[in-house]
UniProtKB/Swiss-Prot annotation:
Locations listed in the record: Cytoplasm
GO CC, any one term: cytosol
Described function: Responsible for the release of ribosomes from messenger RNA at the termination of protein biosynthesis. May increase the efficiency of translation by recycling ribosomes from one round of translation to another.
Domain of life: Bacteria
Official protein name in the record: Ribosome-recycling factor
Disulfide bonds: none
Length: 186
């Protein structure tokens, strides 16, 4: 078999799409405190956009509270400003180098918007998985055309690729269902 078709590579790329989806889901506000909520936020630190988790320790002491212990006292105001301007509706309370970030409950309309956004993220992941499937199928067709595979081998490998795709899409749908239930939970 040639290097052009590698089932492990296809599986790795599909898993990557699912992992990317999980990271996007972690950044969605559900009304429950989560360190992942702050991960997408970048702070202008010393002239460079820096991920917030590189500027302090993030912890979740209570279900509706995130604390952020900023290491450099000169960065506390910049971190506070970045969180307030992030668009996720959080208002930190400064206590020296510690920021307390209460998580307000979500109203029904906002929950529906976030659930819809989660659906969009899942659709992007499905498209990524289908693109990986297409790449695998194209490689198999090319190998058959070049004489590296018989028609029967190509069909068998195509079924394997389709099976991988179905499993990946099923995992995406399970993640989406779980996240939407979490979002809609009052």
């Amino acid at each position: 078999m040639s290097d052009e078709y590698d089932e492990n590579d296809l599986k790795r790329r599909m898993d990557g799409a699912i992992e990317s989806l999980r990271k996007e889901f972690a950044g969605l506000r559900t009304g429950r405190a989560s360190a992942g909520l702050l991960e997408p936020i970048k702070v202008d630190a010393y002239g460079t956009p820096t991920p917030i988790n590189q500027l302090g320790n993030i912890s979740v002491p209570e279900p509706r509270m995130i604390t952020l212990q900023v290491w450099d006292k000169n960065m506390v105001a910049a971190v506070d400003k970045a969180i307030r301007n992030s668009g996720i509706g959080l208002n930190p309370v400064m206590e020296g180098q510690l920021l307390r970030i209460p998580i307000p409950p979500l109203n029904e309309e906002r929950r529906a918007e976030i659930a819809k956004l989660a659906g969009n993220y899942a659709e992007h992941a499905r498209v990524a998985v289908r693109n990986v499937r297409r790449d695998g199928m194209d490689a198999l067709k090319k190998m058959e055309k070049d004489g590296d595979l018989s028609e029967d081998e190509q069909k068998a490998f195509s079924e394997d690729v389709q099976k991988l795709t179905n499993e990946a899409i099923k995992r995406i749908d399970e993640n989406l269902k779980s996240k939407q239930e979490e979002i809609m939970q009052v």
